[in-house]
Structures are given as structure tokens and as C-alpha cells.
Amino acid sequence: MLLLHRAVVLRLQQACRLKSIPSRICIQACSTNDSFQPQRPSLTFSGDNSSTQGWRVMGTLLGLGAVLAYQDHRCRAAQESTHIYTKEEVSSHTSPETGIWVTLGSEVFDVTEFVDLHPGGPSKLMLAAGGPLEPFWALYAVHNQSHVRELLAQYKIGELNPEDKVAPTVETSDPYADDPVRHPALKVNSQRPFNAEPPPELLTENYITPNPIFFTRNHLPVPNLDPDTYRLHVVGAPGGQSLSLSLDDLHNFPRYEITVTLQCAGNRRSEMTQVKEVKGLEWRTGAISTARWAGARLCDVLAQAGHQLCETEAHVCFEGLDSDPTGTAYGASIPLARAMDPEAEVLLAYEMNGQPLPRDHGFPVRVVVPGVVGARHVKWLGRVSVQPEESYSHWQRRDYKGFSPSVDWETVDFDSAPSIQELPVQSAITEPRDGETVESGEVTIKGYAWSGGGRAVIRVDVSLDGGLTWQVAKLDGEEQRPRKAWAWRLWQLKAPVPAGQKELNIVCKAVDDGYNVQPDTVAPIWNLRGVLSNAWHRVHVYVSP
């Protein structure tokens, strides 16, 4: 019924271009055999059966009620004088109880009455509650139209304090003072260094994650690099020649473009914390995103420096240009065999979704290693070398490793475990959210699935009863080559809600082409760093009466 309400409201608003509909709308008393006919505007429905007549009456009533409420709100808004509000005042209005306020430019709006009418659903509009609309309109360009602005104008309650529109002065003593501006939809796990993930309902809205809401994993302050003076240093092989490559030099190599999903080793760590405390950021399901990356192949660059695949074990070590106060840079490594394999498609990427890399994601150059944990995709790349052993970086030798549930911080031996490279099969539910109330009748469940090493996801199973019975979800996304399934699959299931059911325990699990399956519970895979968290994902929801 709510969906019909929204549809009628939107069609009337668009048809009238949000101008005042003539107030002479007569409602005739109807018998059971009469049709409901407002004189203006004329609404015509097809079909003569009683069901159609019932929906005709209900749809028109809903539409008429929305129009009258809208007209009343417009009149009240016009009568109010302009008020000045601070950014702090706006940020305190984020719920129906306090009122839901947003800003656009210098204007402040109270959209409390409109939230339930939002075509994208209340949850999308609530992401902007207490803050600016611009970052969200940038994601969804359909909003930037005159009739949408006219609708919003009716909810204006005042102006934003001019002082709140002045950019703050940069404090040069603060190593994080020059960090880039981030999208307000991101759920922040750490401000310094900045680490954040998109909310679930935005994460799977698109197959390709928009740059502003791509999950951000930083270990140190974000460097501000000049593309004109940037140089990538590639140490040459014995008898070869070391390279100092400008951004233009990298562009002169053959350009390759691939779609790759990046996932942090700590994705879904928060679920491990529920079993037993772990050390690390409390990532939920959003430390994963997908982009279209473009750049030069690492194997081509290494070959120009004289490197070739050798029989002995060797590693390609990467160093970033981000560093701590001691000058220590972030570093990581991958096996030389992967780096030199053209089929592995490792990139020195300079573009992300058709644009230069954003600063948070490694501008001007980062490593992209398809099928491998995000920790090896070194950003702000400054140096590449081939070494007989893996990188001695803390993040390679003393982090991002998995251990038995029995290992604690008193007994852990980091040298005893290999560094994480390929990640296990993974899936998660993004809609509905845990604790949400869903409509009876049918529920739509959405999520993502991915597996490391280029292994393709071949199936996602979904249960509404905690795993007692299962249904197979529909997979969406690009078809990928065998052993090169570098990107995730989005999935969806429309399932009937059992009659009389008051709650649902929704569960999902993915299967890859190696028939690897997610474990059913967290406890057996718990580890002190909270990495490799890929148990069945569970969401508990309530069913409306």
C-alpha cells in the first residue's frame, strides 16, 4: 500500500510540476457500484472488476491525501519567517522524534513529513539526516532536476549560519590536517588514520562502487603528492637498469583495464568480537568494494627493469609514500610468480572508474593485485623491488595472518603463519538490515558474494529460518573468465514470508567453483586479529502484522 501511495504522489507531482493543483476538487458520495471521480485532475484506470475498483478508490484517496497534505505544508512554509541555524543544530535533527533536517547549499530543510514518501525508500534519505544533501545527489544525478528542487523548496525552514560554510584553517602541525574530505555516508571506524565503510544499503546499490563511497583503509596520514614531480622507483635486476618513472612514463606502457573487488582482511571482524575480543577495527560487512581499474601491467614494468621469472622463490616488495613520524612507510609484497604472470593481471593503476585515483585510494599510483587481500594493494606507490624474501614491513610480517582459536597474545608466533594472500569465499546480506521490520507477504533479500584467487562464485544459498531450509538466490553482475573471477557477484532473492511468521532469521552462504563453502559459525574460525571472518552471515528481522 505504501508503494502505491508513493507512486500516486510522485505522478501527481510530476504531472503538475509541483504547482498548486486547483482546489476545486469535488468528492462525490459513492455507493458500492459508483466509481470515485474527482473533477480535477482526471484519473483513468483500466479494468471493471471489483478488485480494480477497490484499488482505484484507494489509489485516488491516497494520492488526493498526499496532494492536500503537500499543499497545506506549502502554505505553512510560506508563512514562516526565515531562521538562521548552525551546523550543530542541523546535525541534532536526525530522527522522527527530533525532526529530520538536511541542508542544500545555504538552505536548511525539515523533510520529516517526506521521508516515508521518498521513492528510494526512507533508509536512503535518512543517510543524509542532519547533514548536506550534495554528496548523495552527486551519487544519484536524478535528483538534480528542477521539479525535485521545487519539491524540496516547500520544506525549507531557514538558512545555514554563514560561518558554518567557511572552510576550516589547516593546522600544519597536525599530520592528518591535509587529509581529503570524505563522503558523509561512510561509516567511520577510525578518524586518524581514516578508515570507513559504506552503509550496506548503498554498498550493493551498484555493481561498480562509486569512488566516494568505496571503503577506505588507511594505516597512516594521506600524502598529498604532486603528479608533475611524482616518480616511481623500480629497482633493476642484476645486469638490468633501475627505472624512475613519471606518471607520463607509466601512461606510455600498454594500458589495461579490469574490474576487481578489493576486500580488507578484517571485513566482518565485528562478528568475531561477539564471540571473543579481538584486536582491530570493528569492520562490519562493508570493508569490500568493486571498481574498474586501469593502468600498466606490473609484469611489463618489471620486464623493462630486466626482471624475469626465476626458479628460486622471490617476492616483489612495494613501498608506499605514506609514512609515520619516524619515516616508516607502509609496505607489502606478493610472490614474483604472481607479479610476472600476465594472466594474473597485476596492475600499477592510475585510474579508478574512469578517473584519476582519488587521494584516499592511492593517487597518483597504486598496486592492484586481483584476487588478493586488500593489504597487498599498496597505495601511493613509491618503490618496487624484487627480493629473495617477502617484505620486512610490519604489515607483512607481523599483521594480516590467521591463527588457531587457541592462540592468544601471549603465545602467538607470527613467524609460524604465512601472510594472507588469497582470501576465502565470502558473502553477506546488505538488505534488509539486522533488526529491521519487513512487510508481510514477500521479502526481498540482497547481498554480495566473492572469493579470492579468481575463483568464481557459482551459488548463493539463502535461508529464512536460520539454516533449516534453503533457497537459491539469483546472481547478478559481469560474467567472468575461468580462474579470473576478480570481481564480486551481487545476488538477490524474493521469497514469500510464511503466513503468521513474526520474525525471520535470514542466513546466506556462498559456494565458489572449487566448491569451497563458508563455515556455519564464527567460533571455529575465531582468531586474535579478527581476520578471515567468513562464517554464514545472519540477519534477524521482524515481520509487520
From Swiss-Prot:
Its cofactor is heme b; Mo-molybdopterin. Residues 175-401 are annotated as: Moco domain. Residues 165-174 are annotated as: Hinge. Residues 402-538 are annotated as: Homodimerization. GO terms for cellular component: mitochondrial intermembrane space; mitochondrial matrix; mitochondrion. The keyword Membrane does not apply. GO terms for biological process: sulfur compound metabolic process. Keywords: Disease variant, Epilepsy, Heme, Intellectual disability, Iron, Metal-binding, Mitochondrion, Molybdenum, Oxidoreductase, Phosphoprotein, Transit peptide. CDD domains: eukary_SO_Moco (cd02111). Residues 1-79 form a transit peptide. Its EC number is 1.8.3.1. Catalyzes the oxidation of sulfite to sulfate, the terminal reaction in the oxidative degradation of sulfur-containing amino acids. It is found in: Mitochondrion intermembrane space. The gene is SUOX. Disulfide bonds: none annotated. Residues 82-161 form the Cytochrome b5 heme-binding domain. GO terms for molecular function: heme binding; molybdenum ion binding; molybdopterin cofactor binding; sulfite oxidase activity. SUPFAM superfamilies: Cytochrome b5-like heme/steroid binding domain (SSF55856), E set domains (SSF81296), Oxidoreductase molybdopterin-binding domain (SSF56524). Homodimer. It catalyses: sulfite + O2 + H2O = sulfate + H2O2. This is Sulfite oxidase, mitochondrial. It comes from Homo sapiens. Heme b binds at H118, H143, Q145, H147. The keyword Zinc-finger does not apply.
